[in-house]
């Protein structure tokens, strides 16, 4: 799993049937303290939301086959899923 910050919303009227009715959000991975890095390793990514996250929230991401299983099956067209909203971080 990875930490990320929700940076926006994706609206897509034409998409794979397995994505119909699912909320798509833009996320950017963050450091272990929850901060956006000054020089991000990668840009924003699209994730499917399973927990009702909103813009600006710190979230947990699951990727690959684990992300697909969140939404019921291995045939889902999903590679990245938001599986949790982070309340606090401590080291």
UniProtKB/Swiss-Prot annotation:
Native organism: Citrobacter freundii
Name of the protein in its database record: Bacterial microcompartment shell vertex protein PduN
Biotechnological relevance of this protein: Artificial BMCs can be made in E.coli by expressing pduA-pduB/B'-pduJ-pduK-pduN-pduU-pduT (in this order); pduT and pduU are optional, while pduA, pduB/B', pduJ, pduK and pduN are essential. A construct with the reversed gene order does not make BMCs. Ethanogenic BMCs can be made in E.coli by targeting pyruvate decarboxylase (pdc) and alcohol dehydrogenase (adh) to them. PduP(1-18)-Pdc and PduD(1-18)-Adh strains targeted to the BMC (PduA, PduB, PduJ, PduK, PduN, PduU) make significantly more ethanol than strains where Pdc and Adh are not targeted to the BMC.
Chief localisation class: other
Domain BMV, first and last residues per copy: 1-87
InterPro entries, per the entry: EutN_CcmL, EutN_CcmL_sf
Functional pathway: Polyol metabolism; 1,2-propanediol degradation
Gene name linked to the record: pduN
Sequence similarity: Belongs to the CcmL/EutN family.
Functional note: Probably forms vertices in the shell of the bacterial microcompartment (BMC) dedicated to 1,2-propanediol (1,2-PD) degradation.
Any one cellular-component term (Gene Ontology): bacterial microcompartment
Any one Pfam family match given in the protein's UniProt record, by short name: EutN_CcmL
Subunit: Homopentamer. Interacts with shell protein PduA.
